[in-house]
């Protein structure tokens, strides 16, 4: 099914609007990382107890990505986007009104449902809406939207929360989503479902050892990162003894470094994806091991955050490129699985960080995170040696 030809300007506008949507969806997933202390204070809870919200959100996305993708596989994509945006916006209004922690968690589950569907269809939609011959750039734009959520979305969300209260942050995200929805309604044509894959494509994907090995690598390395990253805001304030303002600056540095990672990957990713991902995982190991020693100084923490931000962006982009290259015949199913597996890692990391903080010491989150990071490094070296060509991006 082809889309009626439109001017390149309109085609790019459609892709840019999708990238803005990607920015909003990722901002809301990560913004609680910068608001944990404030939310805990307003509900008279410990920060580590509130952190369980991150795990619940991530695991709902993980569990629901594939079922929702299959349930909606025959649904016209424009209508599906409108429905999931309405759910997303309504859930943010509930977050804003949340009168206790349980209601806040319920609102986050609603957002996670919308998130699960959005990420399983977005990559293939961007490819369909892109101007002729600009598929790679369209995907790169979506990845940029995702990256900017870490760079700008999370720190801005934290600043808004700091000065106007965490509820205002969620309300603002909901309003941003409403404006984006109105743009999508105006810009998008009808988009009949295509190339979405079905349950039939699952056994096919499971029989691809290179792809399955990548999924294992994804869950292990993401668990490592989020063990420490989920609690970086309370770590900076409670362990390092630094100010709330510096915690905001650090999140900004960490996110901003992601842009450098994105540029590095854009330049070298097509030819050297395997080497780049391996180097980035090694860099992540070093950053996690040095997190506590670096906590003695603002400058050391800032420098460490630059390398940490570069590493995690290269890892994320590298995985995405490889998954799409290994499953061109079932992009939606492969990306739904990837999104699910990525979120299993986020939830697992946040849970490990939560348990370490509650039952041991928050100061140990870097060391504990380094354990799965080391395992990921060994696994990456092994699988990239076994499938050196298969795992490079293939032209399709």
UniProtKB/Swiss-Prot annotation:
It comes from the Bacteria. NCBIfam families: PRK03545.1. InterPro entries: MFS, MFS_dom, MFS_Efflux_Transporters, MFS_trans_sf, Sugar_effux_transptr_put. Involved in the efflux of sugars. The physiological role may be the reduction of the intracellular concentration of toxic sugars or sugar metabolites. This is Probable sugar efflux transporter. Residues 36-49, 102, 157-168, 230-245, 296-300, 354-363 are periplasmic. The chain crosses the membrane at residues 15-35, 50-70, 81-101, 103-123, 136-156, 169-189, 209-229, 246-266, 275-295, 301-321, 333-353, 364-384. Residues 1-14, 71-80, 124-135, 190-208, 267-274, 322-332, 385-396 are cytoplasmic. One of its GO terms (biological process) is transmembrane transport. It is found in: Cell inner membrane. The keyword Cell membrane applies. Keywords: Cell inner membrane, Cell membrane, Membrane, Sugar transport, Transmembrane, Transmembrane helix, Transport. GO terms for molecular function: carbohydrate transmembrane transporter activity; transmembrane transporter activity.
């Amino acid at each position: 099914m082809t889309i009626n030809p439109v001017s390149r300007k309109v085609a790019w506008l459609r892709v840019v609007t999708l990238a803005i949507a990607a920015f909003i969806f990722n901002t809301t997933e990560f913004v609680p990382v910068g608001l944990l202390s404030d939310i805990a204070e307003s509900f008279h809870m410990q920060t580590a107890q509130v952190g369980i919200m991150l795990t619940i959100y991530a695991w709902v996305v993980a569990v629901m990505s594939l079922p929702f993708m299959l349930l909606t596989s025959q649904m016209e994509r424009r209508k599906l986007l409108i429905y999931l945006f309405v759910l997303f916006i309504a859930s943010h209004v509930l977050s804003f009104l949340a009168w206790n922690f349980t209601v806040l968690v319920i609102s986050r589950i609603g957002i996670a449902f919308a998130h699960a569907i959005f990420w399983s269809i977005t990559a293939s939609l961007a490819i369909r809406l892109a101007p002729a011959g600009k598929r790679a750039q369209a995907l790169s734009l979506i990845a940029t939207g995702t990256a900017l959520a870490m760079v700008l979305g999370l720190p801005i969300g934290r600043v808004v929360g700091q000065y106007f209260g965490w509820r205002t942050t969620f309300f603002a995200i909901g309003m941003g989503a409403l404006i984006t929805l109105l743009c999508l309604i105006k810009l998008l044509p009808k988009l009949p479902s295509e190339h979405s894959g079905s349950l039939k494509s699952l056994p096919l994907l499971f029989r691809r050892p290179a792809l399955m090995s990548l999924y294992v690598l994804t869950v292990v390395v993401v668990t490592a990162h989020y063990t420490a990253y989920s609690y970086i805001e309370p770590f900076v304030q409670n362990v390092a003894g630094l100010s709330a303002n510096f915690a905001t600056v650090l999140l900004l540095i960490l996110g901003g470094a992601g842009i450098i990672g994105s540029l590095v990957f854009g330049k070298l990713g097509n030819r050297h994806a395997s080497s780049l991902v391996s180097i980035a995982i090694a860099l992540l190991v070093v950053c996690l091991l040095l997190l506590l020693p670096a906590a003695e100084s603002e400058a050391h923490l800032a420098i460490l955050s630059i390398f940490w931000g570069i590493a995690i962006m290269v890892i994320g982009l590298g995985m995405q490129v490889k998954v799409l290259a290994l499953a061109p015949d079932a992009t939606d199913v492969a990306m739904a699985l990837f999104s699910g597996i990525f979120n299993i890692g986020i939830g697992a990391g946040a849970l490990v960080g939560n348990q370490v903080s509650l039952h041991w010491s928050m100061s140990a989150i870097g060391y504990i995170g380094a354990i799965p990071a080391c395992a990921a490094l060994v696994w990456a070296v092994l699988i990239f040696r076994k499938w050196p060509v298969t795992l490079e991006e293939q032209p399709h």
